[in-house]
Amino acid sequence: MSGFETVSARMEAMLQVSVQAPVEDVERIMAAVSALDPLIMAAYDSNAFQTAGGIERYRPREGAAAGAESEVRKRPNVVQVGFHLPKDQGLLERVIEAIFQVHSYQEPLITLQDVLVSRSKGLDDKDNPHRWWNTTGDWKKATA
Protein backbone atom coordinates (compact mmCIF):
# COMPACT_ATOMS: atom_id res chain seq x y z
CA MET A 1 0.00 0.00 0.00
CA SER A 2 1.31 3.45 -0.81
CA GLY A 3 0.79 6.75 0.96
CA PHE A 4 -2.16 9.00 0.25
CA GLU A 5 -3.78 12.23 1.44
CA THR A 6 -7.13 13.34 2.79
CA VAL A 7 -8.27 16.87 3.55
CA SER A 8 -6.83 16.68 7.09
CA ALA A 9 -3.94 14.21 6.87
CA ARG A 10 -1.16 12.61 4.86
CA MET A 11 -0.57 8.88 5.24
CA GLU A 12 3.18 8.23 4.98
CA ALA A 13 5.03 4.94 4.54
CA MET A 14 7.27 4.17 7.52
CA LEU A 15 8.56 1.25 9.56
CA GLN A 16 6.99 0.41 12.90
CA VAL A 17 9.56 -0.94 15.32
CA SER A 18 8.32 -2.86 18.37
CA VAL A 19 10.51 -4.03 21.23
CA GLN A 20 9.52 -6.27 24.13
CA ALA A 21 11.44 -5.53 27.31
CA PRO A 22 11.22 -5.49 31.08
CA VAL A 23 9.70 -2.17 32.12
CA GLU A 24 12.96 -1.20 33.84
CA ASP A 25 14.79 -1.37 30.47
CA VAL A 26 12.49 1.05 28.64
CA GLU A 27 14.13 4.38 29.52
CA ARG A 28 17.57 3.05 28.59
CA ILE A 29 16.29 1.63 25.29
CA MET A 30 14.43 4.80 24.35
CA ALA A 31 17.43 6.99 25.23
CA ALA A 32 19.58 4.89 22.87
CA VAL A 33 16.98 5.10 20.09
CA SER A 34 16.41 8.84 20.56
CA ALA A 35 20.16 9.47 20.33
CA LEU A 36 19.97 8.13 16.75
CA ASP A 37 16.56 9.48 15.70
CA PRO A 38 14.46 12.10 17.52
CA LEU A 39 11.20 10.26 16.66
CA ILE A 40 9.62 13.45 15.33
CA MET A 41 5.95 13.81 14.48
CA ALA A 42 5.18 17.41 13.42
CA ALA A 43 5.72 19.69 16.45
CA TYR A 44 6.48 16.75 18.78
CA ASP A 45 9.47 14.50 19.34
CA SER A 46 10.20 11.40 21.43
CA ASN A 47 7.03 9.80 20.05
CA ALA A 48 6.57 6.20 21.17
CA PHE A 49 3.91 4.01 22.74
CA GLN A 50 4.38 1.68 25.70
CA THR A 51 1.88 -1.02 26.61
CA ALA A 52 0.89 -2.00 30.11
CA GLY A 53 2.96 -4.78 31.61
CA GLY A 54 2.25 -8.37 30.73
CA ILE A 55 3.74 -11.76 31.46
CA GLU A 56 6.49 -13.10 29.24
CA ARG A 57 6.82 -16.88 29.02
CA TYR A 58 10.03 -18.69 28.05
CA ARG A 59 12.24 -21.64 28.92
CA PRO A 60 16.03 -21.33 28.71
CA ARG A 61 17.59 -24.05 26.57
CA GLU A 62 21.15 -25.24 26.13
CA GLY A 63 23.26 -22.24 25.13
CA ALA A 64 21.14 -19.75 27.09
CA ALA A 65 23.06 -17.45 29.44
CA ALA A 66 21.06 -18.89 32.36
CA GLY A 67 21.76 -22.46 31.28
CA ALA A 68 19.13 -25.03 30.34
CA GLU A 69 16.09 -25.29 32.63
CA SER A 70 13.19 -27.72 32.71
CA GLU A 71 10.48 -25.27 33.82
CA VAL A 72 8.90 -22.46 31.82
CA ARG A 73 9.67 -19.08 33.37
CA LYS A 74 6.96 -16.45 33.69
CA ARG A 75 8.35 -12.93 33.96
CA PRO A 76 5.91 -10.16 34.98
CA ASN A 77 6.09 -6.48 33.97
CA VAL A 78 7.31 -7.01 30.42
CA VAL A 79 6.06 -4.29 28.08
CA GLN A 80 6.11 -3.58 24.39
CA VAL A 81 7.40 -0.23 23.15
CA GLY A 82 6.68 0.86 19.59
CA PHE A 83 7.82 3.77 17.46
CA HIS A 84 8.05 4.74 13.80
CA LEU A 85 11.16 5.25 11.70
CA PRO A 86 11.64 6.42 8.13
CA LYS A 87 12.47 3.66 5.65
CA ASP A 88 16.23 4.17 5.91
CA GLN A 89 18.21 0.92 6.03
CA GLY A 90 21.30 2.51 7.58
CA LEU A 91 19.29 4.18 10.35
CA LEU A 92 17.36 0.98 10.99
CA GLU A 93 20.58 -1.03 11.33
CA ARG A 94 22.00 1.51 13.82
CA VAL A 95 18.77 1.52 15.87
CA ILE A 96 18.60 -2.30 16.02
CA GLU A 97 22.26 -2.48 17.07
CA ALA A 98 21.71 0.19 19.75
CA ILE A 99 18.74 -1.73 21.16
CA PHE A 100 20.80 -4.94 21.30
CA GLN A 101 23.59 -3.09 23.14
CA VAL A 102 21.36 -1.69 25.92
CA HIS A 103 18.66 -4.38 26.27
CA SER A 104 19.09 -6.69 29.27
CA TYR A 105 18.18 -9.85 27.32
CA GLN A 106 20.41 -12.29 25.46
CA GLU A 107 17.72 -12.46 22.74
CA PRO A 108 15.75 -9.18 22.60
CA LEU A 109 12.51 -9.51 20.66
CA ILE A 110 12.34 -6.75 18.03
CA THR A 111 9.75 -6.80 15.26
CA LEU A 112 9.47 -4.59 12.17
CA GLN A 113 6.37 -3.87 10.14
CA ASP A 114 5.70 -1.73 7.08
CA VAL A 115 2.95 0.73 8.01
CA LEU A 116 1.23 3.90 6.88
CA VAL A 117 1.18 6.57 9.59
CA SER A 118 -0.92 9.71 9.72
CA ARG A 119 0.56 13.19 9.68
CA SER A 120 -1.71 16.16 10.21
CA LYS A 121 -1.75 18.88 7.59
CA GLY A 122 -1.88 21.43 10.42
CA LEU A 123 -5.43 22.61 9.97
CA ASP A 124 -6.74 25.54 12.01
CA ASP A 125 -8.58 23.74 14.81
CA LYS A 126 -8.91 26.59 17.27
CA ASP A 127 -12.71 26.23 17.29
CA ASN A 128 -12.92 22.43 17.16
CA PRO A 129 -14.54 21.32 20.46
CA HIS A 130 -12.95 17.86 20.20
CA ARG A 131 -9.35 19.11 20.44
CA TRP A 132 -7.77 18.91 23.88
CA TRP A 133 -6.41 22.45 23.66
CA ASN A 134 -9.98 23.76 23.31
CA THR A 135 -11.24 22.03 26.47
CA THR A 136 -10.71 22.56 30.16
CA GLY A 137 -8.49 19.58 30.94
CA ASP A 138 -5.79 19.73 33.60
CA TRP A 139 -3.14 20.24 30.89
CA LYS A 140 -4.40 23.76 30.16
CA LYS A 141 -2.41 26.57 31.73
CA ALA A 142 -4.13 28.08 34.74
CA THR A 143 -5.30 31.65 34.27
CA ALA A 144 -4.31 34.12 36.96
Regions found by a protein language model. Give the residues of each.
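Hydrophobic structural segments
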Residues: 1-144
